């Protein structure tokens, strides 16, 4: 008789890989990135410094930062025929689908695509990271029949990203807050999209293929699409009491409310959400309008009281992006663009110490049926 194997739905609690990249230490409420606390990094380091840490395993020296910035800037434009491909997409295409198509198509420009060595994949990752802001912004603008906005060499990575999405030059506060959001979204151990990327990479597929699979995973509203759902929900209410009533109605109907709860942070607030909550308050202070902040706080209190659930990063990132003037359909593509750095690190690690993922199933169907 076959031995009964343990089954864990959703692979909950299953250790699927060994990694040197990141770890969610729920006991100390820390998100460790190469041994550093992500929250502390978000207060003092830029997104590009996080990119270097993730891909090189250490924080950069000043001279290395200058080299990295030049490399990223030199890769910030998209080929003209690549933009024409995006023009062929239907008008109602979601930007995540445009992003997935555009990312997959970039593989055709790589003449060394079969070289999966760490050095080749790192160089590929830097090139991709240079193009992600332009691809994210251009796919949205082209689908909506608008001209893409070209990057400005005088702007920082995050300022350029914001500029290409909104068409306006960001203030120093807006640039700082957006950059911090990219840091917070950059890496998070083994969520669904990272697992998908590593599974694909384990077949010796290329970096583009692994990232394209991750885009498809991140589009789902149980993973990345939650930030868009949060903002649409907030826009349904005009006042704090309206929002509380809206949440109560949804709870009575047993509807899922996006932006709350997390598979890992089950009994605590996502520490990244606290950073975005502070950022939202800063933006509301600057605007002289605290309505969104007060609504979010009221929702946070209500969900903790009624369901014992705490906000995750998406809950506060959504209104932050709204205050920055970013169109809602771009929220999830931003998430993916930021996470590209972590995903690339995971694919490189998977290729370097690979074993093909091949799990089994617990069969629940009939056995040994015969033809009548």
From Swiss-Prot:
Signal peptide: none
Residues involved in CoA binding: 256-260
A Pfam family reported for this protein in Swiss-Prot or TrEMBL: Citrate_synt
Entry annotation: catalytic residues: 223, 262, 314
Residues binding substrate: 188, 272, 339, 358
Pathway: Carbohydrate metabolism; tricarboxylic acid cycle; isocitrate from oxaloacetate: step 1/2
Recorded coiled-coil stretches: none
Induction line: Subject to catabolite repression.
Catalytic activity: propanoyl-CoA + oxaloacetate + H2O = 2-methylcitrate + CoA + H(+); oxaloacetate + acetyl-CoA + H2O = citrate + CoA + H(+)
Example GO biological process: propionate metabolic process, methylcitrate cycle
Superkingdom of origin organism: Bacteria
EC main group: transferase
CDD domains membership: citrate_synt_like_1
Keyword field: Sporulation, Transferase, Tricarboxylic acid cycle
The enzyme's E.C. designation: 2.3.3.-, 2.3.3.16
GO molecular function terms listed in the Swiss-Prot or TrEMBL record: 2-methylcitrate synthase activity; citrate (Si)-synthase activity; citrate synthase activity
Stated role: Involved in both the tricarboxylic acid (TCA) and methylcitric acid cycles. Has both 2-methylcitrate synthase and citrate synthase activities. Catalyzes the condensation of propionyl-CoA and oxaloacetate to yield 2-methylcitrate (2-MC) and CoA, and the condensation of acetyl-CoA and oxaloacetate to yield citrate and CoA. Has 2.3-fold higher activity as a 2-methylcitrate synthase. Catalyzes the formation of either (2S,3R)- or (2R,3S)-2-methylcitrate.
Family that this chain belongs to: Belongs to the citrate synthase family.
Miscellaneous note of the record: Bifunctionality as a citrate and 2-methylcitrate synthase is likely important in the mother cell's physiological milieu.
Protein name: Citrate/2-methylcitrate synthase
Organism field: Bacillus subtilis (strain 168)
């Amino acid at each position: 008789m076959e031995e009964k194997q343990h089954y864990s739905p959703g692979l909950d609690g299953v250790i699927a890989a060994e990694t040197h990249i990141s770890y969610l230490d729920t006991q100390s409420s820390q998100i460790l990135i190469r041994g550093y606390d992500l929250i502390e990094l978000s207060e003092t380091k830029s997104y590009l410094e996080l990119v270097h840490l993730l891909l090189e395993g250490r924080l950069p020296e000043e001279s290395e930062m200058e080299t990295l910035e030049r490399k990223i800037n030199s890769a910030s434009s998209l080929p003209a025929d690549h933009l024409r491909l995006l023009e062929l997409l239907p008008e109602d295409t979601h930007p995540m689908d445009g992003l997935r198509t555009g990312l997959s198509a970039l593989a055709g420009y790589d003449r060394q695509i079969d070289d999966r060595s760490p050095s080749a994949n790192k160089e590929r990752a830097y090139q991709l990271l240079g193009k992600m802001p332009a691809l994210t912004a251009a796919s949205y603008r082209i689908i909506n029949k608008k001209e893409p906005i070209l990057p400005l060499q005088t702007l920082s990575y995050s300022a350029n990203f914001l500029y290409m999405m909104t068409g306006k030059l960001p203030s120093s506060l807006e640039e700082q807050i957006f950059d911090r959001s990219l840091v917070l979204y950059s890496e998070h151990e083994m969520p669904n999209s990272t697992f998908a990327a590593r599974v694909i990479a384990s077949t010796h597929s290329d970096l583009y293929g692994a990232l394209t699979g991750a885009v498809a995973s991140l589009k789902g509203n149980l993973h990345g699409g939650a930030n868009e759902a949060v903002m649409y929900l907030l826009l349904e209410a005009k006042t704090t009491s309206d929002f509380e009533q809206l949440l109560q109605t949804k709870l009575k109907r047993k509807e899922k409310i996006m932006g709350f709860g997390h598979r890992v942070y089950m009994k605590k607030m996502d520490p990244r959400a606290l950073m975005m909550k502070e950022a939202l308050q800063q933006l509301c202070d600057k605007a002289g309008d605290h309505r969104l902040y007060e609504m979010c706080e009221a929702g946070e209190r209500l969900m903790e009281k009624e369901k014992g659930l705490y906000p995750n990063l998406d809950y506060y990132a959504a209104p932050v992006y709204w205050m920055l003037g970013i169109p809602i359909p771009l929220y999830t593509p931003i998430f993916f663009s930021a996470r590209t750095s972590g995903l690339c690190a995971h694919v490189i690690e998977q290729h370097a110490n690979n074993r093909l993922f091949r799990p089994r199933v617990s069969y629940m169907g009939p056995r040994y049926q015969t033809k009548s």
